[in-house]
Amino acid sequence: MKIFLSLIVLFFAIPLIAEKDPKFRFDGKESPNFFDIQKAFYKEYSEKTDFMQSSKDESNKEGMFYHFKRWEWFWKQRVLPDGEFPQPMILQDIYQKELRRSQKSKTEQALSLKPNWKILGPTNIPIGGGAGRVNGIHIPAGQQNIIWAAAAGGGAWKSTNGGKTWQTTTDKLGTLGVTDITTDPKNPNIVYLATGDAFGADTYYGAAPFSIGLIKSVDGGLTWTQTGLNYQQKDTRALSRVLVHPTNTSIILVGGNNGIHRSTDGGVTFNTRFVGDVKDMEMKPDDPSVYYATSGSKIYISRDAGDKWTELKSNIPTTIGRIAIAVTPAEPEAIFALTAKRGSWDFGGFYRSYDGGENWDIGATTPNIIGRNLQGTDTENQQGWYDLCIAVSPDNPDLIFIGGINIWRSTNGGSNWSINTYWVPNQGRPYVHADVHDLDFINSTTIITGTDGGVSLTTNRGLAWTDLSDGLEITQFYRMSISQQRPDVVIGGAQDNGTSYRSGPNEWKQVWGGDGMDNAIDPVNDKYMFVSSQNGNFGRSTNGGSSFSSSINSAITSEEGEWVTPIEFAPNAKPGAASLVYAGYRDVWKTDSLGFWNKTSNFPNKQSRIMLLAHAPSRPGTLIASNFNASYITYDEGQTWRQIQFPNGIASSIITSFEFHPSNDSIFWISISGFGSRKVFQTNNAGTNSTWTDLSGGMPPIPVNCLRYQPNSPDRLYAGTDLGVYYRDNSTKVWIPYNDGLPNTVI
């Protein structure tokens, strides 16, 4: 008997706190409220029709609207009923308890039920694809073969051979998001991680502003401990930068959305030395007592190793919202500043000082070097709030590289710029994945970068770039499907990196762009497949994944889909007929193998979009459709629908999945999000007057995101949760951890 568990989608991060225009960010405020943020965002942009429409355009995928929708989709099922966010340490505490419980369960499980998880990929990254988002890169001084990568949703990764292979030891940390990483200049085995996701904020529970603080390793990353910068409460902190003094390595500076924190004892204790939303920090190359920091439109200086800070008087206008800075040993008095305008988030100008910040002049203000097109002429949906970085050659202060959506290069100190890399392959420029978050010179000719797709390197000052992302297991999957005829065939939709198709071991290719979302493979004939990007832009294959063409989308339905728009194959009631396909927008749409779509529902409340679809394998025509307000069931392929009644206190808005029994359509299970104690229910009489049994015993109070039933088993269910996988059956009667070999991640 074969069972292919399609629930195992390792998000390695899924949207948390979208770092929008600062008026929607938290900026260190206590107890942000989901509904307040949501209301403020839509109020600001509801009248900007041109902005809203272009933000949804696939070609403009990185607008603020786009990032906000990532965040909203993830959190609307996880916040408390009053809109408050759960305390960051809830999962930490539960995780530690469940880890101890998991160790005990290993000794009690039957041999056949012991997990045997292994990575399927993608580990070999195709051209035009990507591994996942890398926020920061660090190379210890004098050790060019050692590379540390800070993944937005996959923890910290280390290469000891210049990026040929990668390893991680952070799979069991309480957060999988890392913004910045550095090592002790005197001892590279001492490593510091600034946890969370300060800029993109699309990360698992360590995301901005839910950082758990600064963590430390003294053995090269084999083990990790918490430092004195330890966020135990609902602190809403986002850490952006960590620096270690080069001669007195007991001094550590950490920048974040609540200021600059300084330790003088190697991280045992910290004191806040500056209050503000700090985005970047650098040390003066020839004087370790002098540090620079940026906050909003201002640059600050400390002349006593970070103890006291004063503002540098520059001519940078107050309309600037974010500044990235760089220094170089080739001209130690120089400071270079790349800026983005607040609100529009396009290029705000390139500024430079050659006397330690006393005087400033402006280099280029055009073209838009942080935009998306080759010419730098685009103006819509800019994202200087998200990706903004700069690096200056260590031996030539005129050679400067900056990162936005692409990489641009200047050979005259920032007065003029030319595009160096482009986010689309084969366009006359070297290809580097879109959205550049970090740039670092390793030496005078070698530069390394972290992007939404992973890690890339040039050894000839940008003439050619090599992707080093193979082996980085940090892809942020939303959904996956597996062929029931060819178990090697897998489709997965991933954040930032489209939809990937696996045809065999280590054989992956990207088949659909945008953010990869839901997908489906016909269980009867796997030559039929569907893939999608955000809000229901579907592609269809009729040749087993060799090619895909556009299928249903909001232009056809005149209905916008949910951020993750569901699609479902279902058996046809006509004997021998091809499978049916259902897609959920505001209503349910249906097609057969011919590909013609028809609406098959007319639900009330047209403002609510369908979040879930599920069919009964044993009874053709039986389908459940669920939106934020209600859930409905049909037994006749959508001709008539009945509203489902759930247990008291369980609303459709917090249901995350429906799973039918494979041979009895009267039985199905539901899973519940949020942090309450009621997590899984079963009904034996599906319909409008269903009765329910609570099957939550043994499940911790965490979001349960999906359920799968194992055929030909003693009613064995698997549950994907915010803390991995659990299972239960008639012999266990309670949920048992099933995580041996899995990282600590959302399933």
Question: Can you say where each PLM-predicted feature lies in the sequence?
Answer:
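Bacterial Sec-dependent N-terminal signal peptides
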Residues: 1-25
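Beta-propeller blade termini and top-face loops
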Residues: 25-747
